[in-house]
């Protein structure tokens, strides 16, 4: 049957049922109990993310399709992150496009209007033509769906590493807006409701949940990839929001198809589904395939009988298929019937409570012998600043209609965080962060670090983080060294979110990100954080003669840094000092509201040098004195490329104000230089380094690589 179930799981369900499941029931169990849908190897740890907060309307405890947070004035935001890694490795266009469609449906399942998307893409070395092909088609798929459906892509991340050569990561986050008293659940609490299905069911995406719960085999798996139809998605979006007041619950048909959607919506009650009533795209489909098909652009609604006609009429006006396929029952049994014959009859609780697994762990944290960095400064600057991770992503943003709906306040690439306007007049900043290189060195510090970095990034536009979702992407959890990094990353994320008092209201776990030889990707957890602008919004601008202020203390911590990755520098990973991140962020927010700064950039990937380069690409030069850097090392390379947390580069005309404000908060700040009109020149300790070639590479690298790919 090609099941992913372990022998222990098969024995477990036999004991619970006191019988042997039939072949179709095995396929249903395989889908519902898949790692993709059940979180059986992670759920016990995810509970540690729960933070009681008066602003949380729907959180991780609720375990629904998206999280929701009160933002005041009767409004709430809905937030979700998802991935389509395995499908994008096989069919990058449809894999990425359906990832966008799926997360939009998660947002509208709460009755919320999607207002922003963010994409996080990681692919392999662009010297390999296949990776160029993957990137082009991933971007094209995201653009095709987002642009067609009218939801702006406002920002994201794009990075490159050999670890993703066979296993690209494609993550999409979405934000929606809804009146908080209009939020819809994805589950029901009473029997007698009719199950209404909108959309056609086809043979695409068969076994997609199971496909996403195993490593890529290198075999023909195209049948497990869903096909995107953004125009149908637009119909689903508009009508779902139109009829939201007429339905009791809404659920997207994602992984596992109807098998999972019906079971989860029933929420401990039961359901009867008549398969012959399901509208089909392909005639004479096998009933078992109908149950687990993951055809896109479908939604399931639980509807009072008196409202069914009105709900279906809304779809009929668009000639979009809509049918009553069953009902919620008081008997806690999930039944799929075909012309009156039971094909599936399984207890709801048995499906919703798969065996939970705690796998062995093996400590892989590295003990590194520190050595002095002895690298030539000039060539090191040129090499690091030329890395593809640091180049402009304008080629990507140009594919997206990021100003559709006119809610985008800060365009992609113009700041460290995206900013959108809300109906209550407030501004919402959004940022995503990940650091797989640091996670490879120390997953615990990485977990703390990505939360802290997202918090700092929001501060650079004047926002304070208030809510987050996470996405945890790892290899096979049964491998002790993989499971160790997973557990450690969760420990770090949990510690940091509790410190900042930021509730994680949802997320995603993606295991089995491995190639056909079983080599796992670098551990790649992500944090998507959102927060309200606290007063004034900072839109970065560079002015001649501005002072360059370095906020925070620099340490000789090069492990997991871009410098270490390129030059194999042995060094300890940075210790994330959350108090320093918090205090330095507060200084930045205060300075923005007092209009004391014109530019703020957190120091992360590429260190201080990369942040200074971010000033230079605006058409200016920068001169600094490394002797002014407050640090535990006098090595110039270490000071320029350390990725110690808690630091910012600030441009100001009142540097002493920044220094004094920092001192009052208990952190350090130093005036290290000035901006000048020497275009593309970085002056370090009175020596000029001409970066014209690097600046040209910054603006043109992606277009040239993609154009030649």
From Swiss-Prot:
InterPro entries (alphabetical): PRibForGlyAmidine_synth_PurL (IPR010074), PurL_linker (IPR041609), PurM-like_C_dom (IPR010918), PurM-like_C_sf (IPR036676), PurM-like_N (IPR016188), PurM-like_N_sf (IPR036921)
GO CC field: cytoplasm
Pathway linked to the protein: Purine metabolism; IMP biosynthesis via de novo pathway; 5-amino-1-(5-phospho-D-ribosyl)imidazole from N(2)-formyl-N(1)-(5-phospho-D-ribosyl)glycinamide: step 1/2
Binding-site residues, substrate: 83-86, 105, 226, 294-296, 510
Matching Pfam families: AIRS (PF00586), AIRS_C (PF02769), FGAR-AT_linker (PF18072)
SUPFAM superfamilies for this protein: PurM C-terminal domain-like, PurM N-terminal domain-like
Family the UniProt entry places it in: Belongs to the FGAMS family.
Protein name: Phosphoribosylformylglycinamidine synthase subunit PurL
